[in-house]
Design a protein with these regions (language model features):
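N-terminal leader/targeting and pre-domain segments
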Residues: 21-40, 149-156
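Thiol-based oxidoreductase modules, predominantly thioredoxin-like and allied folds used
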Residues: 24-27, 49, 70-96
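Short active-site neighborhood of thiol/selenol oxidoreductases, capturing the structured segment around
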Residues: 40-52
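The canonical Cys-X-X-Cys-His
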Residues: 45, 54-58, 113
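Solvent-exposed loop/turn segments at secondary-structure junctions
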Residues: 51-54, 84-89, 108, 120-122
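Typically the conserved alpha-helix immediately C-terminal to a functionally engaged Cys/Sec
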Residues: 56-73
């Protein structure tokens, strides 16, 4: 009986550890992420960041994106990270893609979090219906998620 209880407790601890290790999926290839969003009928969250130099971006990551609340909430959307680092190397393809998206939406500051509803048109092109944007919100994940949820409720 003790062996059975011990085995059960070990299995429970291992499964709890694996659950806590689940990470949020951040896409960096915009086209692939948009296809996933359309296929799964989900909205998209673009995160414009300077991951290695922007203090507010790092603070947003720490206080919101690295929390269990955000991990749970993030299943509602497809996450895309558009990074503009100063010391981390990126491929030219990623740099060009990120700059194109930044110019397309007129993003001028970091962090910027932009929500869109992607729509595949009859000609195969994808229209990105802008729902709204935010950035760092003081008050932690609860306050930030309240702002994000209010933006996601908007429809075009």
């Amino acid at each position: 009986m003790k062996k059975i209880i011990f085995t059960f407790i070990c299995a429970l601890l291992i499964s709890a550890h694996s659950f806590s290790q689940e990470e949020v999926t951040w896409h960096t290839d915009v086209n692939k992420a948009l296809e996933i969003a359309i296929k799964n009928d989900k909205k998209v969250m673009f995160f414009f960041t300077g991951s290695d130099w922007c203090g507010w971006c790092i603070k947003l990551q720490k206080e919101v994106f690295n929390t269990n609340d955000f991990k749970e909430w993030s299943t509602k959307v497809i996450l895309i990270e558009l990074d503009y680092p100063r010391r981390i190397a990126q491929t030219e393809k990623i740099k060009a893609q990120n700059n194109h998206i930044q110019q397309m939406f007129g993003v001028r500051g970091y962090p910027t979090v932009l929500f869109v509803n992607p729509e595949k048109l009859s000609d195969g092109k994808i229209n990105l219906n802008n729902l709204g944007k935010t950035g760092y919100v003081r008050g932690g994940s609860e306050k930030w998620l309240a702002v994000a949820n209010s933006i996601l409720k908007r429809s075009i």
